[in-house]
């Protein structure tokens, strides 16, 4: 099963990079709360078809948080955590949009941690598509 999961993740590379480009090209810095909200909803929209209960936690004058749960009675429990905000000010996504150059991805937040978000989403998809239905999954 492990090889099937890795194989699927490799086959998902183009879709994963498309998702990464989508979220990198959204300003979601400390001064772009609406961008953080947009990224949160992209995450929620991705997970909902897989049976996740998605909750958007709003805090006054701060960013939106996503709590996505897919509770299952099995023994396996997986929790993935990350953050959607970057240190880059508004306008950074337009000034330095996502690109791949010499096999490396560039753009605001690629390394911290928008690539981690894309990887998490497609890992969850691969697990569920390959028989991990009894696994309790939580993303925050």
Where are these regions (language model features)?
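Acidic/His- and Gly-rich active-site-bordering loop/insert found
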Residues: 2-108, 128-134
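Acidic/histidine-rich catalytic neighborhood of metal-dependent amide-processing enzymes
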Residues: 114, 118-140
């Amino acid at each position: 099963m492990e090889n099937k999961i890795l194989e699927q993740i490799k086959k998902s590379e183009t879709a994963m990079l498309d998702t990464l480009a989508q979220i990198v090209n959204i300003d979601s810095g400390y001064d772009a709360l609406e961008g953080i909200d947009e990224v949160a909803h992209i995450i929620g929209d991705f997970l909902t078809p897989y049976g996740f209960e998605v909750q958007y936690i709003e805090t006054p004058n701060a960013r939106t948080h996503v709590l996505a749960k897919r509770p299952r009675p099995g023994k396996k429990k997986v929790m993935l955590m990350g953050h959607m905000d970057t240190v880059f000010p508004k306008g950074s996504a337009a000034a330095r949009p996502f690109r791949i150059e010499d096999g490396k991805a560039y753009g605001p937040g690629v390394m911290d941690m928008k690539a981690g978000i894309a990887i998490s989403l497609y890992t969850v998809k691969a697990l569920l598509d390959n028989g991990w239905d009894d696994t309790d999954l939580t993303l925050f």
